[in-house]
């Protein structure tokens, strides 16, 4: 609980992992937390051990972000009810490199999974980042959440400290 600040670490074991050849970032709109959890299960079934992140961002997050982050570019045309930021890793060079048709297999697979999710009405909109700059832009919005909330609270006369980072236990 004290993260090593009150004791001496005498031994440690490290498990090293191969760096991914590619990380695909996508942003989707789910209508509810329930649909977002179903979405996570669909992605886990197609990409076991490859989901690097799955971040839920409700509509209030986007409203606060729009009010407090300069030059914010929303990932979708309208403010999502429940935004989900997903990173999927690819460890295979074949998955991350264009094939004969010029398609990147991991991206094609993500598109197919998204199509299934649309058909199941789990999502209402989605976008896949085309480059690292788009991915960094989305992540910078997510990472600015605490500062955005602080600015919003300073504008109001509400309590002066409000932070949240919600984790949902994932059942195996």
What label would you give each PLM region?
Residues 1-172:
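Noncatalytic alpha-helical scaffold of FAD-dependent oxidoreductases
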């Amino acid at each position: 609980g004290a993260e090593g600040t009150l004791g001496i670490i005498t031994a440690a074991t490290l498990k090293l992992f191969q760096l991914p050849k590619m990380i695909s970032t996508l942003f989707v709109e789910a209508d509810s937390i329930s649909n977002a959890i179903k979405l996570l299960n669909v992605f886990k079934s197609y990409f076991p051990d490859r989901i690097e992140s799955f971040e839920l961002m409700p509509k209030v997050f986007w409203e606060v972000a729009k009010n407090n982050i300069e030059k914010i570019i929303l990932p979708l045309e309208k403010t999502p009810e429940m935004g989900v930021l997903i990173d999927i890793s690819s460890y295979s060079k074949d998955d991350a490199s264009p094939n004969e048709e010029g398609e990147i297999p991991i991206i094609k697979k993500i598109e197919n999974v998204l199509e299934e999710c649309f058909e199941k009405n789990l999502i209402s909109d989605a976008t896949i980042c085309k480059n690292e700059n788009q991915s960094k832009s989305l992540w910078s919005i997510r990472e600015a959440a605490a500062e955005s909330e602080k600015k919003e609270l300073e504008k109001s006369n509400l309590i002066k400290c409000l932070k949240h980072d919600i984790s949902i236990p994932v059942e195996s």
